[in-house]
């Protein structure tokens, strides 16, 4: 139950993380949302975040800036990914990575452990932006002229 939102436009990357968080909240309405910044979080903070608390059996853990994570945090997330794939009571984890080469080893390690990757489109050209907007309208069964 680990997802990595990878690369692309920063606004769309944030939007996808918000969408996944809302989907997880709809599936587990009693869950807490715990946000960690991988820049200063360590493996102990991650272990505490995914563990049950007095108020909720599970938490929805959002790990921002995965590209800044240290090796130990990456190893713990990968190990959790391997364990949580068969656990119905596992806490969903949503990792946000800006893309690029920084933190690529940790990204690859977590993907290899079984995480689901969601690549965000990079909208640098005007045609790509227009096509993306049109797809968003179509997805919501709306029309724009």
Predicted regions and their residues:
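Non-catalytic interfacial helical region
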Residues: 2-145
């Amino acid at each position: 139950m680990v997802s990595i939102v990878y690369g692309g436009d920063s606004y769309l990357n944030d939007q996808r993380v918000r969408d996944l968080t809302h989907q997880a909240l709809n599936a587990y309405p009693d869950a807490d949302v715990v946000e960690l910044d991988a820049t200063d979080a360590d493996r102990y903070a991650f272990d505490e975040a995914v563990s049950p608390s007095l108020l909720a059996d599970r938490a929805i853990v959002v790990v921002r800036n995965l590209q800044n994570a240290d090796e130990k945090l990456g190893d713990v997330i990968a190990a959790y990914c391997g364990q949580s794939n068969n656990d119905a009571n596992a806490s969903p984890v949503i990792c946000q990575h800006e893309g690029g080469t920084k933190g690529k080893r940790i990204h690859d390690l977590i993907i290899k452990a079984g995480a689901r990757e969601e690549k965000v489109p990079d909208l640098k050209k005007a045609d790509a932006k227009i096509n993306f907007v049109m797809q968003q309208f179509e997805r919501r069964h709306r029309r724009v002229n």
